[in-house]
Amino acid sequence: MEQAYCTAVFWRGGEKIDLNGLKPDAVRCLSVTGERKVNLSFLRDYPNLEELTLMEKCEGVEVLSELKQLHTLSLWLSAPVSWDNVSLPGLRVLHLRGEKNGDITPLLSSITNLHLEEMRKTEDLTPFLTPATRLQKLYLQSLPAVQKLPALDGLPSLYALKLYELHKLSDLSALSHSHLR
């Protein structure tokens, strides 16, 4: 049975954490929203997190390396963070929304599912795809500046590609050299 998302909301005047009656070590899915900058060290209390959504402002992402069960990460940050000291070998799904998530290259080597969304200024997708050699599913949504798909031949396991609202996309020649079945 799929667990509902628990929520942690932080604003200037306080915070509210709703665990749906669960103890922290029983929480598998958590959504964190920070209208003020949130130090993520509190996530140490949630060692069994499998899915995590981070929105708005946060710091201390290094703590994510301690979440050994984490396989799905969604980011929609309003201020970039450094991912250089974060190791997530179990991460399989990465959902990026917006362009202020920082250089996420260190997160890409193990993922099999990548969703890029609402990146208004991003023209070249190559920096996201080159390190993601295990990628199986790629979802591209609301990327208005993308005119051309990058080479996909370096993604031998890619079998699913979804394109949605890429209004300037005019060059699909990369598909002919891909491993898509």
Q: What does each of the following model-derived ranges do?
A:
Residues 2-18, 23-63, 69-147, 151-170, ...:
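Concave beta-strand-loop units of leucine-rich repeat
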